[in-house]
């Protein structure tokens, strides 16, 4: 496609499978250096091997993004491995949590706060690189009724609102902020 991404640094959380892996694959195919994280070490290693076939730098590290300290350490290591950070793709998912206190809290920690914390840490690095983008992976469930998992839809709606505010707040620093909202896959 020739998107002029050769040598750009891209972090994709939740990048070992599904949408996250597809996003990381797209960036790697365009020559970007990519860092991914996930909880499952077997899926993470398989994704690392797959992404490495494109010839770019690939950094992969196990991380539970709901753990603020673990996320901070991962993002620091990823920035160091990539040398620069131009794009952060926040793609964590806690889909399928129960409609109880524990399910709600886990959804908040994974689907909202991991993206908020990741953005806080990434924004100065992206600005230092001359600007770039933060992309939040939301869901159609954040835009319309979702009866299967109430916490998931509500938290994705909150992420959509955060994205709007963050886009305005970071524009003057050369950082575009968008959310994508895939439907059922």
Describe each region flagged by the PLM.
Residues 104, 145-153, 165:
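Active-site loop-to-helix junction immediately N-terminal to the catalytic Tyr of the SDR YXXXK motif
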